[in-house]
Amino acid sequence: MAKLTVEDLPLEGKKVLMRVDFNVPIKDGVVGDDNRIVAALPTIKYVIDHGGRAILFSHLGRIKKEEDKPGLSLRPVAERLSNLLNKPVTFVPVTEGKQLEDAIDNMKNGDVLLVQNTRYEDVKDGEYVKRESGNDPELGKYWASLGDVFVNDAFGTAHRKHASNVGIATNMPGKAAAGYLMEKEIKFLGDAVDNPERPFVAILGGAKVSDKIGVIDNLLDKADKIIIGGGMAYTFYAAKGIKVGNSLVEKDKIDVAKQILDKAGDKLVLPIDNVVADKFNNDADTKVVEGDIDNGWMALDIGPKSVEEFKNVLKDAKTVVWNGPMGVFEMPNFAKGTLEIGKFLGTLTDATTIVGGGDSTAAVKELGVADKLTHISTGGGASLTYLEGNELPGIAAISDK
């Protein structure tokens, strides 16, 4: 079902409530990586260029007690946003009440206002009440009453049912739309999963099989090949009876891995060789081994033959979805597999290439190939939920066309 988009809404003179994802790192009152703020700019600019009054909502971090609040104020974000837009941004240091309502009433067409961190609502009078993250119906209704229309551009929180995304949207039937970022995520991830150009290859990495079981299960029916790297590969090794030494293995998931292997046939591509280390440390002694891994050694990256094998599988692909690193990416000596795969994806100019997850995204940025890829997903958990084939509450609540 097609969803309303920001371009379908009347904006001139309207109070446009917008859920954005400004959950960015802040240190000493200064925003570190502002990628998520930059990603929201096209939708914000569209709204204000068309005479709308942009009222922005975002969460930042987790708030479980009063003492968490001062360090998680969105004030530094308002300052960075103001610089990026090259215009004033009104910051309102509260999430409800007269101060907020007056500030909204005083807005003119084209103005931008940022409401305090929505998760301030999770703690009231010292009590952890989760009004925002528990989708308190009264809070969603109240926030919805502050505007005329609603735009959700926060794909990163679409898998969560919060008052600031689902709550507002359900109280504005027929007036809740997707922003450009949300629209892009729905298009690329949706097409990749439901209507991919083939061959469709998924690359799944990261430490734990348990995090990706749902994704593997869903994609086995849809992908032509699934490449497995990272720590999760060694639970599959164990399921095949290959010795894994001291490598990471989820013993309680070996049976699940066996079932996946039986179902997958030759669809699943595992590493042929691995870079093993004598301890979990960047300065460990290392060697490359094929097959069994001896006791006292642990696999921390895929080996050169695996890299070549994975490239071989990828070279003819027309759709590629990559989520998760091939090794311990944060240690430079075990980042090579991840970087090699990232570099190779940048050469697949005829394919739709979609990257999600923190380490995979960091790798393509470090390599400078981000602009050669079709789409970099802004939502870690949200993109995994989407790849599992599950409905995302934040998207479901957006009005249908």
Swiss-Prot record:
* List of residues binding substrate: 21-23, 36, 59-62, 119, 160
Q: Which CDD domains match?
A: Phosphoglycerate_kinase
EC number(s) for this protein?
Answer: 2.7.2.3
Listed under GO biological process in this entry are: gluconeogenesis; glycolytic process
Main subcellular localization, coarse class?
cytoplasm
What does the UniProt keyword field contain? Answer: ATP-binding, Cytoplasm, Glycolysis, Kinase, Nucleotide-binding, Transferase
* Annotated InterPro entries: Phosphoglycerate_kinase (IPR001576), Phosphoglycerate_kinase_CS (IPR015911), Phosphoglycerate_kinase_N (IPR015824), Phosphoglycerate_kinase_sf (IPR036043)
Any single Gene Ontology cellular-component annotation: cytosol
Pathway of this protein? Carbohydrate degradation; glycolysis; pyruvate from D-glyceraldehyde 3-phosphate: step 2/5
Q: Which domain of life is it from?
A: Bacteria
Catalytic reaction list: (2R)-3-phosphoglycerate + ATP = (2R)-3-phospho-glyceroyl phosphate + ADP
| Record bears the keyword tRNA-binding | no
Q: Name one GO molecular function term.
A: ATP binding
**Compartments, as annotated in UniProt:** Cytoplasm
- Binding residues for ATP: 212, 330, 357-360
- Describe its assembly: Monomer.
Q: Which family does it belong to?
A: Belongs to the phosphoglycerate kinase family.
State the name under which the record lists this protein.
Answer: Phosphoglycerate kinase
